[in-house]
Amino acid sequence: MNRNGRFGNLEIAASVKNLLKYLPGSYLQKFYRLPQKGNQHAKRFMLRFSCRPFRHLLIDVGIRAHLIPDSAYEDNYMEHLPRDGLCSKLKKHLNNARVTGINYYPGSKYFEIEFTHFYLAFDFYGVGNLILFQKPDNNLNSSDSIILETIED
């Protein structure tokens, strides 16, 4: 981990290896935006999957990604978090979506969770990005292939 607390290439590779152990075949159940303290550029999200014992994925976009054990967060705490536009959009497209794989490009600061019909990409360069891609089907119309949502304060 760098001095500023951001994941480097090795930490991302280790985190992806851990994700590959638990997430494939599980279902995304909930998507939360967690409240922020301090750093206004860090965006923190919690993804809850159906796999156990590590079913919570904590993502600080642009900073770090961790699988968290069930005991770390109480469900009743997360149920009272406010919903926002990004969470609603992701819930619309990824509600109960099955994880089919984790794609990682060695040496990069980028990985994506592959669902049945979408990719959820996490970029750890600079302030980071969270991008939802629709899987391309064999249609000629490519205008619907990317769904982008910007993360703003």
Model-flagged regions — what are they?
Residues 1-153:
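Acidic, proline/glycine-enriched N-terminal capping motif
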